Design a protein with these regions (language model features):
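Phosphate-coordinating catalytic segments in nucleotide- and nucleic-acid-processing enzymes
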Residues: 6-8, 49-312, 316-319, 388-429
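Switch/communication elements of ASCE P-loop NTPase nucleotide-binding domains
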Residues: 1-52, 283-418, 422, 429
Length: 429
């Protein structure tokens, strides 16, 4: 499935102007602090928000119900303690488990809004039928939840739940851009881009100036990998999401087996998620049968293992956008070429889209020439971040498949090395 997505952003952080095509393998190059990672994050949160809009609205709904859940929890456990007889609990434990699992096990993600409403209202009715809440200290908690709402007591709580559910339904139906804007404000903690637009087949589907967020057809999942060190670590939202995907078990498709064999041959082993593994969630079994904690193996093996696990779990297909910052980091020079080949073949055989931020000449050239050999060079697009007249601001120049300007920028580093070489010292004498 050939993608034809164009992303335009202007006057945001280090980015002066960028118009980036996502049509296969997109590689952006440039010096540090030129805005490459900013574009990566914009793309990730855009497609993550758009594709998971309903789940994100439900997450917001759970936050809106935070005080209600607290009230239901303490009321239930107080009732158990006061009753004292586990065999004749006055409130059905199964009904409470449904409420507890909404948040604890995140069952809300797989429930309809009407089912969530039914669970909550059923349990509220149970509490009021079995306990004297109206004439207890818990009534003050109810008043705090309802705030200025006119309806109070059980009818007030039922109204509160139904109104929040109705608001969530309305948001899912209309898909306001405000949800994406809130994500950006939370992420960057500063003003928004002056311009941020995404078009698909020349039709604008996302804009900070549009009221609604359309659903892209060519990409329904974005996965952001900014370091192989993120395995098993919870620090950022995109690390949490990546680890969830790495743990989810799925079926291996027939067209994925060749790629899995290629990765296994490169790293001489298999990465697995095993809940019974004693040292970590993730393990790596070498070709000789020895098993290790994946967190303790070479970082290069981790880099390949992430792709291996995503493939195994069925999370990489022709509508996936893999966003990888500096994929060459921690890789041996020989593995840089093999990693680039893996990227090209994933695009060729599966249709995966890539957005790569790199400043490594081996990675840049390997993508170019392996892409040509594999017949997908028309789907490879390079961009170079170039300084503007304004300090700390860069425009992104589209290069097509021409990598010569990128190597010209790499030569700046060689020039700087020569400034400190022995010959330069002699020239100064």
């Amino acid at each position: 499935m050939q993608s034809n997505i164009k992303v335009v952003t202007e006057n945001f952080r280090a980015i002066g102007y960028a118009a980036i095509q996502i049509s296969g393998i997109t590689v952006v190059a440039g010096e540090n602090s030129s805005g490459k990672s900013t574009i990566s994050k914009l793309l990730y949160y855009l497609f993550n928000t758009s594709s998971n809009y309903e789940v994100l609205v439900k997450e917001e709904l759970m936050r809106n119900f935070h005080d209600l859940f607290y009230f239901l929890n303490i009321t239930y456990y107080t009732a158990i303690n006061e009753d004292g007889n586990i065999n004749r609990r006055i409130i059905d434990v199964k009904k409470y488990d449904k409420i507890k699992d909404l948040r604890g096990k995140e069952t809300y993600k797989n429930l309809s809004l009407k089912e969530i409403e039914l669970y909550l209202i059923t349990f509220i009715k149970e509490l009021y039928a079995k306990l004297d809440i109206q004439n207890s200290r818990y009534n003050r908690y109810v008043d705090d939840i309802l705030e200025d709402q006119q309806e109070k007591g059980i009818e007030g709580l039922k109204y509160f739940v139904k109104e929040k559910i109705k608001q969530a339904e309305n948001k899912i139906q209309k898909r306001p851009t405000s949800l994406f804007i809130e994500k950006l404000l939370d992420l960057f903690e500063e003003k928004l881009p002056e311009i941020f637009e995404v078009s698909e087949d020349d039709e604008v589907i996302v804009s900070l100036k549009k009221e609604n967020l359309s659903l892209p057809f060519m990409v329904n999942k974005a996965i952001y990998i900014d370091t192989p060190m993120s395995i098993s670590i919870s620090k950022f939202d995109h690390w949490d999401e990546l680890n969830k995907l790495l743990k989810e078990q799925g079926d291996i498709k027939s067209y994925q087996r060749e790629m899995l064999s290629l990765i296994s041959d490169n790293i001489h082993g298999e990465a697995e998620y095993n809940i019974d593994w004693p040292y970590s969630d993730f393990s790596f079994t070498r070709a000789d049968g020895k098993t290790f904690d994946l967190n303790e193996v070479a970082t290069g093996i981790k880099a390949f293992s992430i792709i291996q696990l995503l493939l195994k779990n069925g999370h990489i297909d022709n509508r996936t956008l893999l966003i990888i910052d500096e994929p060459e980091s921690h890789l041996h020079p020989q593995w840089i070429v093999e990693y680039a080949r893996m990227i090209v073949l994933l695009h060729k055989h599966i249709g995966v889209k890539f957005f790569l931020a790199s400043h490594n000449p081996d990675m840049v050239s390997a993508i170019r020439y392996i892409g040509e050999k594999e017949g997908v060079l028309d789907n490879v697009n390079y961009y170079l971040a170039e300084k503007t007249e304004e300090d700390y601001l860069y425009n992104y120049r589209a290069l097509g498949s021409d990598i010569a300007p990128i190597f010209g920028s790499f030569n700046i580093a060689i020039d700087r090395i020569s400034q400190y070489s022995i010959e330069s010292d002699h020239d100064d004498l």
